[in-house]
UniProtKB/Swiss-Prot annotation:
Keywords: Ribonucleoprotein, Ribosomal protein, RNA-binding, rRNA-binding. One of its GO terms (molecular function) is rRNA binding. NCBIfam families: PRK05327.1, rpsD_bact. Residues 93-153 form the S4 RNA-binding domain. Belongs to the universal ribosomal protein uS4 family. The keyword rRNA processing does not apply. Part of the 30S ribosomal subunit. Contacts protein S5. The interaction surface between S4 and S5 is involved in control of translational fidelity. One of its GO terms (biological process) is translation. PANTHER family: 30S 40S RIBOSOMAL PROTEIN, SMALL RIBOSOMAL SUBUNIT PROTEIN US4M. Pfam families: Ribosomal_S4, S4. It comes from Lactobacillus gasseri (strain ATCC 33323 / DSM 20243 / BCRC 14619 / CIP 102991 / JCM 1131 / KCTC 3163 / NCIMB 11718 / NCTC 13722 / AM63). This is Small ribosomal subunit protein uS4.
Length: 203
């Protein structure tokens, strides 16, 4: 299944949240496209709620269904912890997401492009695979010539805070995954239990 390349604002309005994290998509109209106002939404079934939650998280991280499902299956093989929380933690450890969490990119999509175009180093070595799983203690940095990219400067200037599971050295422009993320440090808009229920019926 190919990755969706249409306008993200439509998906954001449909879900009622900002998928990019900027908030711009729903700042003017916080109701679904096609609705004639915020109070014109139909009731959603249990099936619909589960599907919506799955799509919400998948679209947040920009994965296709196969990538998303495979990661969910892998999370189920982790012995400790809850399946849904482990799944979200694996998503958080993707290289493109860590680049986003460090503030080197304004959105996950922008972070994915930085990785794809070879701007990102992991422990000093170039890694151009967005799905690369960052390990605790690994250092994330930019190639020297990439530190002057305007989009990187703009992203860093806009940083208000970073999640506590990462650290960042502003002078060196390097960051580290200092520990695994805890549930309350991950996406608060997501009910991962609904996603587990969805896949338990499908797999």
């Amino acid at each position: 299944m190919s990755r969706y390349t249409g306008p993200s604002w439509k998906r954001s309005r449909r879900l009622g949240i900002s998928l990019s994290g900027t908030g711009k998509e729903i700042s003017r109209r916080n109701y679904a496209p096609g609705d004639h106002g915020p109070n014109n939404r139909a009731k959603v079934s249990e099936y619909g709620q589960q599907l919506k939650e799955k799509q919400k998280l998948r679209w947040m991280f920009g994965l296709n269904e196969r990538q998303f499902q495979n990661l969910f299956i892998r999370a189920g093989k982790i012995r400790e912890g809850k399946h849904g929380v482990n799944f979200m933690a694996l998503l958080e450890r993707r290289l493109d997401n860590i680049v986003y969490r460090l503030g080197l990119a304004s959105t996950r999509e922008q972070a994915r492009q930085l990785v794809n175009h070879g701007h990102i180093l992991v422990d000093g070595k170039r890694v151009d695979i967005p799905s690369y799983e960052v390990k605790v203690g690994q250092e994330i940095s930019l190639r020297d010539k990439s530190k002057n990219l305007q989009q990187v400067k703009d992203a860093l200037d806009a940083v208000v805070s970073r999640p506590p599971f990462v650290s960042f050295d502003d002078s060196k422009m390097t960051g580290t995954l200092v520990r695994l993320p805890e549930r309350d440090e991950m996406e608060p808009e997501v009910d991962e239990a609904l996603i587990v229920e969805w896949y338990n019926k499908k797999l």
